[in-house]
């Protein structure tokens, strides 16, 4: 239960108070959000609609794309509305909800990236047993484990709810997150800050290193492969490792340190909450011929149906 709390809403300071800069940022973040949602949902629909994309790798990619779209939706709409309407306030309950959902999808993505690395290891290092090991039941179980991991990680954020907030209520950020909220609490948050480092920073650091090692092991096993298979495996691994670096490096910068609010934090947060999720569909499709062909077929069918429907209406 919250005690000594007279704060009912927070003010998200955002990036700039200059109207011209806000308009430019509004256009930029709106376009980025639209590209993110359309790109990720296109991958989800494409994988569901294409029988050729029925392997476990594409199942996990569809799940990752859905999480990316949901993750971005947790942050971007509020940011965009604030820039357009100059409404920068968020209720206390809304702030806590954003914090929880943000970390839920972020935690789920971290564990899902681990699952995807394991999937690639089995596919490349044990190809004859791949479909036996990564059967449908195992895939769903791994997905559930990733989601539970995200929930457990986000459940820790509830500790902020019980902290007293007496004022000021200005968050020097564009969204609700642990570090800026802990700085506003009217109590000593040193030990809570240390648990944030463990719950977010240390986990990101450990998993990031494990993922890099796993991709290194996979790459070292490609020596015995033919040039064609080696090229395909390298393409898949390079896509996965690129997303891992783009997502984890900013997270580590933010969370592997005591509670403090650096000017660069907002821009680093934009990178791993918005930019990475926009780039993810491009990274996974540009070097994957199967994905490109499936998307071309899907868009070709939709375009044909649209043209036929339009002609029918005109006739």
Curated annotation (Swiss-Prot):
Positions on the Extracellular side per record topology: 1-23, 78-98, 157-192, 256-266
Presence of the UniProt keyword Secreted in the record: no
Localization per record: Cell membrane
GO cellular component, one term: plasma membrane
Keywords: Cell membrane, Disulfide bond, G-protein coupled receptor, Glycoprotein, Membrane, Olfaction, Receptor, Sensory transduction, Transducer, Transmembrane, Transmembrane helix
Cytoplasmic-side positions: 48-55, 119-137, 217-232, 287-315
One Pfam family matching this protein: 7tm_4
Disulfide bonds: 95-186
Residues linked to a glycan: 6
Location (main, coarse): membrane
The keyword Glycoprotein is annotated on this UniProt entry: yes
Topology in the lipid bilayer: Multi-pass membrane protein
InterPro entries noted in UniProt: GPCR_Rhodpsn (IPR000276), GPCR_Rhodpsn_7TM (IPR017452), Olfact_rcpt (IPR000725), Olfactory_Receptors (IPR050427)
GO molecular function, one term: olfactory receptor activity
Transmembrane stretches, start-end: 24-47, 56-77, 99-118, 138-156, 193-216, 233-255, 267-286
Function field: Odorant receptor.
Family: Belongs to the G-protein coupled receptor 1 family.
Protein name: Olfactory receptor 4A5
Organism: Homo sapiens (Human)
Lineage of origin: Eukaryota, Metazoa, Chordata, Craniata, Vertebrata
């Amino acid at each position: 239960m919250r005690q000594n709390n007279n704060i009912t809403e927070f003010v998200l300071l955002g990036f700039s108070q200059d109207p011209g800069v806000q308009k430019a940022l509004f256009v930029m973040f709106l376009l980025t959000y639209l590209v993110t949602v359309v790109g990720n949902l296109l991958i989800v629909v494409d994988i569901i609609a294409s029988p050729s994309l029925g392997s476990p790798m594409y199942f996990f990619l569809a799940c990752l794309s859905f999480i990316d779209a949901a993750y971005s939706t947790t942050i971007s709409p509020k940011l965009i509305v604030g820039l357009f309407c100059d409404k920068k306030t968020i209720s206390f309950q809304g702030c806590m909800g954003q914090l929880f959902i943000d970390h839920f999808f972020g935690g789920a993505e971290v564990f899902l990236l681990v699952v995807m690395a394991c999937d690639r290891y089995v596919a490349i290092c044990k190809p004859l047993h791949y479909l036996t090991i990564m059967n449908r039941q195992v895939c769903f179980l791994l997905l559930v484990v990733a989601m539970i991991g995200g929930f457990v990680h986000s459940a820790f954020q509830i500790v902020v709810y019980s902290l007293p907030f007496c004022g000021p209520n200005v968050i020097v950020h564009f969204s609700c997150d642990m570090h800026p909220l802990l700085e506003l609490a009217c109590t000593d948050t040193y030990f809570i800050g240390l648990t944030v480092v463990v719950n977010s920073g240390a986990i990101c650091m450990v998993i990031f290193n494990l993922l890099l090692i796993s991709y290194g092991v996979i790459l070292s096993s490609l020596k015995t492969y033919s040039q064609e298979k080696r090229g395909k495996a390298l393409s898949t691994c390079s896509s996965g490792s690129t997303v891992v670096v783009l997502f984890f490096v900013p997270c580590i910068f933010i969370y592997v340190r005591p509670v403090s609010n650096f000017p660069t934090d907002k821009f680093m947060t934009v990178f791993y909450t918005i930019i990475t999720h926009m780039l993810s569909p491009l990274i996974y499709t540009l070097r994957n011929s199967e994905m490109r062909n499936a998307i071309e077929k899907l868009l070709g069918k939709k375009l044909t149906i649209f043209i036929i429907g339009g002609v029918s209406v005109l006739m």
